[in-house]
Amino acid sequence: MLDFAIFAVTFLLALVGAVLYLYPASRQAAGIPGITPTEEKDGNLPDIVNSGSLHEFLVNLHERYGPVVSFWFGRRLVVSLGTVDVLKQHINPNKTLDPFETMLKSLLRYQSDSGNVSENHMRKKLYENGVTNCLRSNFALLIKLSEELLDKWLSYPESQHVPLCQHMLGFAMKSVTQMVMGSTFEDEQEVIRFQKNHGTVWSEIGKGFLDGSLDKSTTRKKQYEDALMQLESILKKIIKERKGRNFSQHIFIDSLVQGNLNDQQILEDTMIFSLASCMITAKLCTWAVCFLTTYEEIQKKLYEEIDQVLGKGPITSEKIEELRYCRQVLCETVRTAKLTPVSARLQDIEGKIDKFIIPRETLVLYALGVVLQDPGTWSSPYKFDPERFDDESVMKTFSLLGFSGTRECPELRFAYMVTAVLLSVLLRRLHLLSVEGQVIETKYELVTSSKEEAWITVSKRY
């Protein structure tokens, strides 16, 4: 249920291909500014590949042609929206369907039945309640997992380089699996097995949609199908175990089991939530720590807030909610890292943006990465400045884009809480330090990551 999610060229173009295959779009560009196809068969795919990612392609396209632009995927028209003003005209606040969920389900070959409005609303509420209840019931577990990572880092000599991406992914995998799927994943080997299968599925979904490469490679296809089958098998087992029984630990699956959903719906929704939450949580944790090591004054201010609010007492969910500056740091992390730079919606009916007509069944991209660095929307857009979120109008814009408030997706809400707890635990005891000379380059994938491992060092506060 990720309302606004990023797609890298490998992934998003595959999703675009899937949607446009299912819903053929108009051949007419309707007078929308943009570029003509580079090749008859592939459209502007070569231009996107040459740009390095879809996000970078859209940045260049919007710089050249303005807030509403068009390009071609194969022989199908795609429209991209690149400012807050045009997004406001297109975003429907009453939409309950999530485009990322729908497309990800199609790539997993699940049934993407939209159902009726009331059913979609009910499933959305189940998701939201599932996140709320699993965070509340498993808060002590979250503290425990954070403290385990703290103990590991405390054991390192101050000169030792810490592989941040690796550790954050491991922490996210443990947190998500145990809080979403339960005590099965208290076993370290089960987490490792899940992480391996998750990695295989995550890296393969979308591949081969353009050239059929997955179907052409018997080995790759079998590895993908085996990994997906193993993930589904463990989920089916857990769903069966949780039905009709009471457990002291309330996990995410329980909220779906207790709702009016059949086993296949529970399986699909849990799979989508698990796949997305693991990566979003891992990357939010990674980028937050990266920025804190780069901006020492911001780390100092965050530590002072944590010390003032938490003191020497236990960390509680109520206290975490009081960490206002921490939330600003996380919002600015999402914005600066462009954690989710592209989203997509199918144009259900013919629509109009400014003076442009968007034909029915056109794929409309929300170029969120472009919007998040738009100087017309953000002052000093390339500066990491958490205090910009003191401004209520800035928060309203952020909420409109789906990163906060009532439009905030459940996976991101989950990640915000997990990251806030982890930072509170770590900063109480440690200074987080950058490695001199390290340059972290960004890779725009399904969730934005660093191209290489990001290294940090730590030193003890006491």
UniProtKB/Swiss-Prot annotation:
Pfam entry (one): p450
Cofactor dependency: heme
Gene3D superfamilies assigned: Cytochrome P450
Lipid bilayer topology: Single-pass membrane protein
Cell location: Membrane
Residues annotated to bind heme: 409
The entry's keywords: Heme, Iron, Membrane, Metal-binding, Monooxygenase, Oxidoreductase, Transmembrane, Transmembrane helix
Main location: membrane
GO cellular component: membrane
Keyword DNA-binding in annotation: no
Family indicated by similarity: Belongs to the cytochrome P450 family.
Name of protein: Cytochrome P450 20A1
Gene expressing this chain: CYP20A1
